[in-house]
Amino acid sequence: MEVVLTAVWARVGRVRVTLFYAAALAMVAKVLLYLGPGVHSEVIRHVSTNLHNLGEGRIGTLIGSAFVTADGPIYVWLPGLVAMLALGELLWRSGRLAVAFAVGHIGATLIVAAGLAAAIAAGLLSTSIVNVADVGMSYGAVGVLGTFTAAIPHRWRAAWIGWWLAVAVGAAVVSGGYFTNAGHAVALVLGMLVGTRFGQPERWTATRWGLLAVAAAFGYLVVGYNSLSLLAPASCGVLGALVVWGGASLIGQRRPAPIL
């Protein structure tokens, strides 16, 4: 029995960051649900990484915003998030998962904030956007999704890159440039770049392929979501995958054969 418990604990320990974060999200959501919508709205206002809070130097919002969500019931999307983070932790180990999530969450937040500030200064956006709430885990999750690019087998990597970049850009365009969709595109690119520095991933197994399927579906719902259609980004994704894969194949065919 002790041997079995030790083996189970060892397996659980391999995804400890994922489990800790999921438990923290669930706990915060439960407490806010108990305290009521008024308190929930007030907490969102205080931890939001909008221009108002960042402009006042509330740097702590860069951390706190990742633990508070404004979207539907947590049980709807938490399983997908757990699958995505668990896969990242199994492929890259705990430390690199934390780095990927932090780069996606904090990096995309700051880049989007800088873009919004520049657009307001240029008169392209109304100043009312400075108070729009911006909380949740989506930037960090998409950053982790981006790192999978470096772990995907080489023969499928070009199609993977083309699909996700086209989905992200397509969703941003369809949404009319809404800053959250733009942030997802930024987080995705940051994750792809960070993944190139992670070295060799752990080997793929049937379990990890299964997690990838769930993570990809969840990632599409996050990245491709907009108020108009979920199909438009998918169309862009298919086109992007075909174009990038075709281009990569053409380049590969034109490479000169090695001299023996």
Model-identified regions with their sequence ranges:
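Hydrophobic alpha-helical transmembrane segments of integral membrane proteins
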Residues: 96-128
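Membrane-interface micro-motifs in multi-pass membrane enzymes
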Residues: 128-148, 179-189
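Hydrophobic, membrane-inserted alpha-helices
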Residues: 61, 79-86, 141-147, 163-173, ...
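Membrane-interface helix/loop boundary segments of multi-pass membrane proteins
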Residues: 83-101, 148-155
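N-terminal TM1-TM2 helical hairpin plus the immediately adjacent luminal interfacial "cap"
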Residues: 33-94, 116, 126-127
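N-terminal signal-anchor transmembrane alpha helix
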Residues: 2-45
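C-terminal transmembrane module of polytopic alpha-helical membrane proteins
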Residues: 1-10, 173-260
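Aromatic-anchored segments of alpha-helical transmembrane domains
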Residues: 26-31, 105-114, 163-177, 212-226
